[in-house]
């Protein structure tokens, strides 16, 4: 009974948004973000997708939609070259539907209440746990695909095996399968065979017997991830020696000797991060002195809290290739840590969040990587996207771009942005993305490359750029200026006149008599407040800064009587535009906040 109570208390922990499982995993998250942020193709933020969806719901289920989304996307992307169909395009309605299903599934998963595991253990073990098992396998496959794609981008020209064939065979062969609880098996004819064939001159794909023989010799020992072994000579003799050495180390370790099975780059990461990876089959202890052991879902007694003097990311990775390899290794270790969801003492819901976010982010990044790998050149990362590529590079600036610097409007139907990050959000504004990473799309701001089907509606707040006429447009002089606070609407869409039919002078005089024209620069420009950019430029009648804002004298009775709607507690529809007194609005200048609505005003007051 006490054990069940303790388990219930552990599972009842609310991880919140973007939570991590332990200090080591948190450290690796920081390393991933730091390393990938310095690479031209990056995730920008691992958990951005999780921050942009609803936090809690009351339902359990619909994880199948996310699994189908990941399975179908990965299969369609790589199956096209095998005749299985066309890859899913970023602008296809099918991908949009899958993304919506994934968002729904993510909200449902985030809505899983921790105490339901204790209340309904049968439902959890029969329904949820198998689905989590599948999700973890898919995340590992996506990670293998991601590593292969990154390796492909750095592949030198002139090798015996073409980079595209190498990546295709690598992704198709790196098929992770779980057997039991702590065993991971990789399909035969793995990536190390392809690398060996490139160095030993076995270019022909028909030499299957030789490759299979060498593969068996390699796989007799423990599998070593040669994807990350950059400078390793993979000739036939060295592979045999390596297999014998690894078998001897494994036997010595089982007998309690000093033998050690460790990947050299994994060891390098451990030293740089000051962290320890404790996998399901083996334990990597770091060779520095650390504090007392802390809790880990995989091996509670074998993990160490990082030393305080250690940096959270490698500081001596100067070139892009080293950073890519280190980032891939950090991702690989993170997925290994996520296997702790099978541990009864692990905080299941924190790991579940990480697995889903990582899998979704990996799929989105792989979509971008495919755009580069489909090009003819594989020497370096392309500086400029090719024709038809949905991202366009903007000239780099030092630091953040200051408000008021105009964006260059893209061509019809195009995208605009650095390509540094991915917009997961379907609407609104991201708070953590720097200004220079904003992306413009014909479908409206905030849609991102995943949601290009929306139409630009025009008007204020409907798109990233408003449809106000430019100063050189003939219709610019025919715009109706908004009324002032004494009697009218502040914002009104411009009137466009077609076929040369311009109102006569008499009609203009009558219109001027019916409405009171407002002096310019007395209201803040809504476009400038939202985006830091105004298409009207210096000819805009609205103020673009507090220095330009003109304060006019109000009438004697302006805001001297209380607003009856505000007194009734119902809120005022006019907000700051109301002519009557509303608490703090009495006798204030006629400055209008374009974001403050009546509903927000009611909440504030």
Swiss-Prot record:
Keywords assigned? DNA-binding, Metal-binding, Repeat, Zinc, Zinc-finger
This protein's record includes keyword Metal-binding: yes
Which stretches does UniProt call biased (Low complexity)? 389-403
Biased-composition ranges, Basic and acidic residues, are 201-218, 238-250
C3H1-type ZnF: 519-547, 557-585
Matching InterPro entries? ZFP36-like, Znf_CCCH, Znf_CCCH_sf
Q: Which Gene3D superfamilies match?
A: 3.30.1370.210
**SUPFAM superfamilies noted in UniProt:** CCCH zinc finger
Any Pfam family hit: zf-CCCH
Which GO terms fall under molecular function for this chain's record?
DNA binding; mRNA binding; zinc ion binding
Return the annotated region ranges for Disordered. 198-218, 238-261, 375-403
PANTHER family given for it? CCCH ZINC FINGER/TIS11-RELATED, ZINC FINGER CCCH DOMAIN-CONTAINING PROTEIN 47
Q: What is this protein called?
A: Putative zinc finger CCCH domain-containing protein 57
